[in-house]
Amino acid sequence: QPATAEQPATAEQPAAAASAADGEVRIALRGLRGVVADKMSRSRREIPEATCWVDADATELLAARRAMNAAGGPDAPKISLLAVLARICTAALARFPELNARVDTEAREIVRLERLHLGFAAQTDRGLVVPVVRDAHTRGAESLSEELARLTGSARAGTLTPGELTGSTFTLNNYGVFGVDGSTPIINHPEAAMLGVGRIVPKPWVHEGELAVRHVTQLSLTFDHRVCDGGVAGGFLRYVADCVEQPAVLLRGI
């Protein structure tokens, strides 16, 4: 009967109305959000990741940055904390090159990379992006600071080129700017690792045998367990922590 033929259409209408009444909002995963979703999903599927953490006393690092900026004079560009952390990253990767790598799954090969292109997470009105500092291993703290500032400005203005958003080999994630202590970030595929830095806050800390208030941060390293074992990952993170606690450690590489 004609009435029977119309019943399926009639039955669907209340369901659609119910969804609208529940306040359900559907947002298409397209554009930047879609690209991020696809990349993070692929990373979770393909990379057997592990994370290690360490707390570090950053008091001397903050003092070293102040001294570096004071030494530059009033007209010199200021070196950002992110740039100092990036410089520590490049030094650590020079000591532990296993983490500047990717895995060729089809060939079943680990590909170690001579050049370091450092990605860093930047939050914008359009979402999270990862601009890339090319050949970061060739730059000092001042050069890193200038390039990080330039790329951050372009990210916020929405003027980054595709070449400035691709090709990173290692990522630095300063999630401390969001006021959090720790995280287990998803590796930026096809990289092999990501260094995370939490907020720097005053905490009770045993310093030189006595209890004192020091500026402490939590560092994390999420790494692809296919490219290295825990010894390498732990050694990398410990070296980063040593540089944070005693910036003079970096001078040994000069």
Each model region followed by its residue ranges:
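C-terminal catalytic/motor cores of large multi-domain enzyme assemblies
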Residues: 2-254
